[in-house]
Amino acid sequence: MGGLIPLGDVSRRPARVPLVTVLIILVNVFVFVRELMGGEAFVTQWSAIPAQIFSGHGWITIFTAMFMHASWSHIIGNMIFLWAFGPEMEDTMGRARYLVFYLVGGIVAMLAQIAASPHSNVPNLGASGAIAAVMGGFLVTYPRDRIRSILVIFIFVKITFIPAALLIGFWFLTQLFSAGQVAHAQSGGVAYLAHVGGFIFGAVTARLFESTERRSVASSV
């Protein structure tokens, strides 16, 4: 078994503290702790269940579900990816634009997932769709940046540096392939369609969310 864990961009550093990214992480952790206290009833109430949404109930869960997680490994993995790519995108867009970008990306991702299985009663939850939007935005904004990553192959562990285009591009292809395999599955699992939907949203709209200041610099080059 193996994997690649992104740690952060080594090609640039944000000009300011990524307060919004930190806030998003803290909110996710708070909600997860609340989940542990509330149990299954809390998860069912605030996760996005396609059959309920398409019957006209629980539309708010399209928003709330992006702050929910199924396990410690789920939230830790998501927050690692957010911390690896979020600060640079927050710096690029500005705090307010970045927050809107993140939230809308999460909503679009959740809609993509539930639209594929409108009659499913499986709860959909997780920040990965919104984070996929951040990754899509990062890919089109900083494709040549090097990402410090931990490469794990069985017992072999190594710090390596991988171009963002290669790392994120490969990740997206795996999600796209997996989404095609499970598009109509009714059982629980990874929300690949949310990843794909969020990523495409991020890649297509990231430039629109760039700060006015950065656009001015880019247009004058």
Where are these regions (language model features)?
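A detector for small-residue-rich transmembrane helices and their helix-helix packing motifs
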Residues: M1-V221
